[in-house]
Structures are given as C-alpha cells and as structure tokens.
Amino acid sequence: MLFDKVKAFVVEIDGARTGTEPVFHGGQAVAGRVLLELAGAARVGALRLRARGRARAHWTESRSAGSSTAYTQSYSERVEVVNHRATLLAPDSGDIATLPAGRHEFPFSFQLPISLVTSFEGKHGSVRYSIKATLHRPWVPARCARKVFTVIEPVDINTPALLEPQAGAREKVARSWYCTRGLVSLSAKIDRKGYTPGEVIPIFAEIDNGSTRAVQPRAALVQTQTFMARGARKQKRAVVASVDGEPVGPNRRALWPGRALRIPPVGPSILQCRVLSVDYSLKVFVDIPGSSKLLLELPLVIGTVPLHPLGSRSASVGSRASFLQDWGLCTMMDRPEAPPEYSEVVRESQLVCASPGPSSLLHDLGVTTEGPYFACLQEFRYCPPPLYSEEDPNPPSEAVRPRCMTC
C-alpha cells in the first residue's frame, strides 16, 4: 500500500538456519518472535499468533451413472494435530494502541503435543505445520506473516519387534501355453525389520529353478502411501531402490549371500495417523518367461533412530550369523558397517525427487510412475548416538561366545 507504515513483518523461530525450515519432534518447546518494523508511528488493534498442524487427505474419482452420465466423487478428510492460539499485543485500555517508528519484537513460545505425525507431502495428502501471525489495524486490512516448520517423529528401530528377522518362501509351477515347464521356488530372509536411510539391507535368498527356461531374480524397496477419507482408501506405490541378480539357468540353484540394497534418503514410516500412512516393503521376485512372476514380500519399517552400537546391534548380527550358518554361508559374511545417523543421510541438498527407476521393474510390480517417487525431509537434528565400536566392552565368556559373529 502507498501509505503503509509497516516496513517488515515476519515470524522467526529460534534455532532455524537461514533459508531452512526448523525441525522439531513431539514434546519439544517452540520459541521465537514476531518482528515488526515501522516506518512511522502506527495505530495497532492487536497482534495474534496461531500455530497449526494438519493432516489431510483429498482425491477425486470419476464414476459412471449410466451409458451417458458421469460424475466426479470427491473424498476429503482432515485431522488437526496442533492448534495453539496466543495474543502477543493487546491494548491495556481501549481498542487501539500506538506503536512508535522502529523495530519491535514480540516473543512467543508454546509446547508441542507429545505425539505428532511426521511432516509429509504426497499427491493425495499432506501433513503440514506452520505458525501464522496476524496484525490487526483500524481501517487497514489485516496483515499476515507465516512460518513453516517441520516435525519428524522418532521411529526407534531398536525395539524387539523391529529387530526380528523377516523371512518367507514361495513356489510356483511355471506354465506356458498350458504346458507345465517345472517348479520355481524362492526363499528369502533379512536380518531385521527396521532400518534407517543410508543403511544397506543384506538380502539372503535361494532361487531354485526347476523349469526349462532361465529366470531372473530381482529385489526392490517399495514405498506405499495410503490415504483414507470417508471410509475409502487411495494408494500410491513407488519403487525407491532396486537390485538385480544374475539369471538362473534351467534346473539350476542360486544363492544370494547378502545381496546389498542400499536405502536412499527417504522419509520415515508413518504408522499412527488417521488419514494417511507411509509403509515400506522389500519385494523379492523372480521373472519367469511366459508366466507371471513369483513374488515374495517382506515388511519393513524405516526409522530415524539408528541401531545402537552394541546391545541391539549384537542381536541383529547374531540373527544374521545364525541364518548364514543354516545356509552354510558363514564364510561369506562381511563385517557390519556402523549405521549412519538420520541427519547424515537426509539433508537439504537431497530435497529433490529421486530419478525414476527402470520402467520394466515398475511395470512388473504394478507401480505407477507419475508424481515424485518419495518425499525427502529436511535435516533432523537429533542428539548423536554413542560412537560406534566393533568391540564389546563387556564380551561374553568363551563358554557362551557365539561361534560365528564376524566370520
């Protein structure tokens, strides 16, 4: 406006770096200030602040009501997870206060709820957090300033359920033009259910090809976004990482002694939201010429708190060693790497969409290719875990020492 005396009106949050969104988790205190700079004395009615966090899902579907009639069905659902209001400036007497020219600061602080939902952006839904300041003045439209912040809820993979090995087995009779070509079987296992971005998933698999044609084993990390509204569901799947094995010839058997699949910088699993969820799974499958693929799916949870360096990690390595012993692969086991911190993997420079994976792999898994492959989140500044060490300060006695921990 030509005679507007407001030179600057912004919301600042403590701890935020220039050009980045501040990051919090449930239970933390959010503090900052509203900055108001006036070119001259101005009359102000009130300055109000509102912090909001919303999870929403929305999509439309085309429906047919006959041969010549069509309509669009809309589905929407919204959940408010944060709603904080505060008045930062209210005149003591009367309805109007006069502020002199210059810079004015109005501090604020509030506590986030203990349990929140991780920030998320998807095609059919989102989880967003923001702080909005509104300046009310007489005879002038209200002026607003907004600041967005990110929430990442801790997902600790050091729980017994997420440290359990995941395994499965499937078999299929290969057929072509009503002719039986033999039995193809697949068994696979990973040493635990929970991982963090940047870690490598060692895939142990056995492919037994009893058919008369060569088959192609593959594995893929798949993200599934599920949106829920008015009793309906909408899903979006994307391949975020994949690895191919060597073809297995007719009547041959092949082993994967820990085929490595590295997890890219993806957002963590979202499991406790009423309107949307983000799940991950490892799909190990075999392409059989002339027949449908043989598919085995193992559930995964992508967390933010990495594996502890000693206790739970020893259990994970032990389960992996036990699996290798069962398959006679103990000599092939590599020394495990220390898991990276979440903030080392998911950084600002990686806030771009991943490049599309192989189109044939997407088609095989029934995954659509439109839209971003995954939503990366900004750097999450947890306190760093203890330094990683391969040596246990309290080693077990020789009588109970595992036979194959670091073969």
UniProtKB/Swiss-Prot annotation:
One Pfam assignment: Arrestin_C
A GO CC annotation given for this chain: plasma membrane
Superkingdom of the organism of origin: Eukaryota
InterPro entries (UniProt xref): Arrestin-like_C, Arrestin-like_N, Arrestin_C-like, Arrestin_domain-protein, Ig_E-set
Subunit structure and binding partners: Interacts with WWP1 (via WW domains).
Family annotation (PANTHER family): ARRESTIN DOMAIN CONTAINING PROTEIN, ARRESTIN DOMAIN-CONTAINING PROTEIN 2
Stated family: Belongs to the arrestin family.
Protein's UniProt name: Arrestin domain-containing protein 2
